[in-house]
Amino acid sequence: MTRLTLAPALLLVAGGAPAQPPASDSLYKRLGGYDAIAAVTDDFLGRLATDPSIGRFFVGHSTDSKQRIRQHVIDFLCSATGGPCIYKGRDLKTSHAGLGITKADWDRSVEHLVATLAKFKVPQKEKDDLLAAAGALEKDIVEK
């Protein structure tokens, strides 16, 4: 995955397990499936890229690179929430190493995630589940 702050958009990796049909009560299904996750990803990444305080992590990427990042995020979220996708990107610690992401950067990213989930009217339980899982990733993303 290109070095970029994907922060809380990325949830717990499924560890390369083979794709399985999503369980009917999986977070993937409860969020609305692939298309809903893709729409949330697009909005969230757009917010991050245009934010004056954290947009610096998106500078210098080609259109192709940005599309690959987008697809990695979608695949990660799909897989991590119990969907049928297989995430083939690097682990988050490796992907974010050397970027110097601070606690303030992390907190700002979480604010954008919350705003994105509100925009899409994600129900509270799903929002809570997603934010709790995202919180577990902070240790692999924040360096300072």
Task: Please place each PLM-identified region on the residue numbering.
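Bacterial N-terminal signal peptides that target proteins for export
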Residues: 1-7
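N-terminal signal peptide c-region/cleavage motif recognized by signal peptidases
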Residues: 14-16
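Core of compact, soluble alpha-helical bundle domains
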Residues: 19-144
